[in-house]
Amino acid sequence: MSKVTKQSKSHKSSELVSLAEKIKQKALENRKQSREESQATEEANTASETEAAVIEETAEPEEGFSSFRELDLVPELIEACDNLNFTKPTPIQSKAIPPALQGKDIIGLAQTGSGKTAAFAIPILNRLWHDQQPYYACILAPTRELAQQIKETFDSLGSLMGVRTTCIVGGMNMMDQARDLMRKPHIIIATPGRLMDHLENTKGFALRKLQFLVMDEADRLLDMEFGPVLDRILKNIPTKGRTTYLFSATMTSKIDKLQRASLTNPVKCAVSNKYQTVDTLVQTLIVVPGGLKNTFLIYLLNEFIGKTTIVFTRTKANAERISGLCNLLEFSATALHGDLNQNQRTGALDLFKAGKKSILVATDVAARGLDIPSVDLVINYDIPVDSKSYIHRVGRTARAGRSGKSVSLVSQYDLELILRIEEVLGKKLPKENVDKSIVLSLRDSVDKANGEVIMELNRRNKEKQTRGKGRRSRTATRENMDKEEE
């Protein structure tokens, strides 16, 4: 809920107004103090083995190319790389691009943010220049947001080549997408369920002459149970003459089975993804007494006011509620979760990336595959049920050498989950310093605001049910498979 209604705002209690005023006053103090402390904090983090852990890619000594100009690329592609400031390749690019340019199938093992999209986009575009035909390449991605980002990369790299791309994902109008497909794009970026819908139902659309197939974030494609759909897609595209790239964060038995079914004599290009301690991400936790999680969250947002922050929740309902709570208390927040349509999700991300909203409240849909630059703080409102999700969440900050911080709100029911996470990280997470007197002073106001938000959400849900009453539900399609889990 991006905003509460005017009626709700007009009934703000004096306590809420008082809290908002305290927040503003604290913000001024924090901004002044942060200038004085930021340099000292950076030096302290660098000088010591701080409480930090994140997946870091440690590349082996590179034997590949050191500049994109060394490659046998068409001039238009080299110029596009220059325009995008692609100078020195990332480890996965250095390992994957040379064999890909030789026409090899590729298995790329690398994390999000490693530059892997360009690692498969550059070879595809280079060959497309010499053999332009419609439906030349298809890239499969697990989420709509990742698919859109891949499209943007292809558009940027192919900007001087006249490349036509389209993004085919759930949550968007099928007829509009069918019209886009009839314009014969060179590159199709899609989520599996929606692509299969079009292969079965869009007249005149087929991938019988497909030259490239890319499965990006393949481990997550399989985690989200796209396996049966992938099998059906593979049966609808040619095997002979097709080049296939498979990119994944990990090499599991499912990935191994998929690569044996879809790749031919692939070259494995792996970038180490061991859990390593780095000094750019400080991780802490707060043990939260019952009934105080909302209050501790507002306390943290107040302490770090002005910082770009992602708050992760386990459910879509919590994401919507917390976004509304933040906005009611005059924090600038927007929500991102699977119940939003594609335009709403794109709009939320754009607001956050542009700095118009400083807080993004999200389910794990945003934890992986999204390039969100310059995130200062990650707050785990709900602890994820698996350690891998935790690693991907905190990996949204402290990227590309920047400093960052994560704080996890731990209830008595989360202790076992935290122990598992600490075991994976190989260290204990220290406790965040908290002024409990300030936290307790905020409790009544935060609880009152939370009650108002819940009432407003309930009112909206009743309105939706009333509007939808009597309507016949339409048959669900595989579009639902493109929606992320809560």
UniProtKB/Swiss-Prot annotation:
GO cellular component: nucleolus; nucleus; small-subunit processome
Positions of short motif DEAD box: 216-219
SUPFAM superfamilies, per database record: P-loop containing nucleoside triphosphate hydrolases
Keywords annotated in UniProt: ATP-binding, Coiled coil, Helicase, Hydrolase, Nucleotide-binding, Nucleus, Ribosome biogenesis, RNA-binding, rRNA processing
Catalysed conversion reaction: ATP + H2O = ADP + phosphate + H(+)
Domain Helicase C-terminal residue range list: 300-446
Ranges of biased composition (kind: Basic and acidic residues): 21-38, 476-486
Keyword Phosphoprotein attributed: no
Main localization category: nucleus
Superkingdom classification of source: Eukaryota
This enzyme's EC code(s): 3.6.4.13
Residue spans of biased composition, Low complexity class: 41-52
GO process terms (BP): maturation of SSU-rRNA from tricistronic rRNA transcript (SSU-rRNA, 5.8S rRNA, LSU-rRNA); rRNA processing
Stretches assigned to the Helicase ATP-binding domain: 97-269
Biased composition (Basic residues): 1-11
Gene Ontology terms, MF aspect: ATP binding; ATP hydrolysis activity; RNA binding; RNA helicase activity
Role this protein plays: ATP-dependent rRNA helicase required for pre-ribosomal RNA processing. Involved in the maturation of the 35S-pre-rRNA and to its cleavage to mature 18S rRNA.
UniProt domain comment: The Q motif is unique to and characteristic of the DEAD box family of RNA helicases and controls ATP binding and hydrolysis.
Protein name: ATP-dependent rRNA helicase RRP3
